[in-house]
Amino acid sequence: MLKLRILSVGKTKEKWLEDAFNEYQKRLKANLQIECLWAKDSYQLLEWTQKESLIICLDPTGRLLTSEAFATFFSKCWEQGGSRLTIVIGGAEGLPLELKQHSILISLSLLTFTHQITRLILIEQIYRATEILKNSQYHK
């Protein structure tokens, strides 16, 4: 089974966001084992990623992708990274330069979101990507 780690700063405080995140996590459960870790700060994210081979960081300077391009990108990352993939969401101060230099940078939008909203958008796009790759009706 494919394993996805989502690392981010701070926990989700709003129940409705957590419920929505959990719904997508439940939908993905058949294909993906998702582990979420909440860091105190961005430097803890750096510590947690020291031994990771393939890291994707969400960053405003990263490459913007359509949902279809994200699905293709996501699929290629699995091929490159094996059965484990790590996606990192920084806090308000952004990500440490050292982490950004050793990662693939993508952006979900030109807009700025809280890290809590970003987690929800990210997991929905991951779900959408899996559905695009299966050619399901979800994306149509």
From Swiss-Prot:
Q: Which Gene3D superfamilies does the record associate with it?
A: 3.40.1280.10
Residue positions annotated to bind S-adenosyl-L-methionine are 58, 90, 108-113
Q: Which family does it belong to?
A: Belongs to the RNA methyltransferase RlmH family.
The source's domain of life comes to Bacteria
Report a single Gene Ontology molecular function.
Answer: rRNA (pseudouridine-N3-)-methyltransferase activity
Q: Please give the subunit comment from the record.
A: Homodimer.
What is this protein identified as? Ribosomal RNA large subunit methyltransferase H
Is the rRNA processing keyword given for this protein?
yes
Gene (UniProt): rlmH
| Main localization category | cytoplasm
In short, the EC number is 2.1.1.177
Q: What is the organism field in this record?
A: Protochlamydia amoebophila (strain UWE25)
